[in-house]
């Protein structure tokens, strides 16, 4: 995260109390560039050609849901953060790490919103997100996109191993190991899932303000 201007009165007492009393995973701020231009920080998940894509949109209302907080910036509910397991340190690309944690929250029934009551401005240039499709993206895929939700739990169909091996940049043994580990992780947490990625994307419109 780059330098931000933090002022003494950036958050009023009433706003802080409202945010801390609301059981939301993360409340993100409005963000401005150093030229006072508001950034399109509402991130909207969609599917294009069978692949998950995130589109940034301008904020049109005082309260909006977002797929993830841009640049990790937000007020996090500590208890919910811990329940989700925090950020996955094995995903070293910041973009995919942020997206992994945030969408895990959504898939497990949590919410992330943007509040107009909090506004921050960058002192320097706006950070660029590295959305390169690489090994880190594949780790994100296994934990978030590969699982299917049915009835009351999630699982990764064994049939998805073929597509994963085809796209993996690692050798066959490593790809199979990664896939097996991901299936074990989803099996361990299967009842924490409340939906899968297609359901989240399909129902996003009703969450948009």
Where are these regions (language model features)?
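Short catalytic/ligand-binding loop motif for oxyanion handling, primarily in non-cytosolic enzymes
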Residues: 6-8, 34-39, 68, 121-124, ...
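Amphipathic coiled-coil/heptad-repeat helices and related helical stalk/stem segments
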Residues: 10-12, 59, 98
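Active-site-adjacent helix/loop segment of glycosyltransferases
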Residues: 111-208
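Alpha-helical elements of Rossmann-like donor-binding domains used by nucleotide-donor carbohydrate transfer enzymes
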Residues: 13-17, 100-104, 136-140
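Conserved donor NDP-sugar-binding/catalytic core segment of glycosyltransferases
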Residues: 5-46
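Acidic metal-phosphate-binding loop of nucleotide-sugar-dependent transferases
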Residues: 2-6, 91
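A short, conserved alpha-helix in the catalytic core of glycosyltransferases
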Residues: 68-85, 91-118
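Short, flexible, basic/aromatic active-site loop/helix in glycosyltransferases
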Residues: 29-30, 44-67, 71
